[in-house]
Amino acid sequence: DMEGSAYRIREVWYSYPDNKCRARQSYTRKDGRITEKDETSTSQIYDMLSIMLKARTFNTSQWKPGKRINFLMTDGNGVKNQTLIYRGKQRVKMRGGNKAYRCLKLSFIETNDRGKEKEVITFFVTDDANHIPVRLDMYLKFGSAKAFLTGARGLSK
């Protein structure tokens, strides 16, 4: 990843020995220094992409806005406790079109070393059997960015 003049390569390899989740991690800095870590947990360990995919399986029918989902996440430089917050349901209009979806709204929260929480990504998945991610709002150090679904095929409905 790149952020300003910082350049990093983050890699994670997953395996599941003895019914545990093992995350072998490599973190390469711009100057070539490499940090490797190997962490194992009885709980599943996620990365940014896999936690969004996991959100597609959530049954939120009994959830109230504000529900917190705690999980372990690797960033290639270690495994940390992280949080998703269910924000409720919202109608999301797509960019430049007439299309709108009723969505589940979830926020990915990072907690710094002092315990202060910061919303990093808000993502929206359709509130139907498909649970398709249709929008991401990312809050970056240098501003913000949004990503929108532009098409999908093979959906169940």
Ranges and model annotations:
Residues 1-26, 60-157:
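Acidic, serine/threonine-rich low-complexity disordered tracts
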Residues 16-58:
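Hydrophobic, well-structured mid-protein blocks that either form specific transmembrane helices
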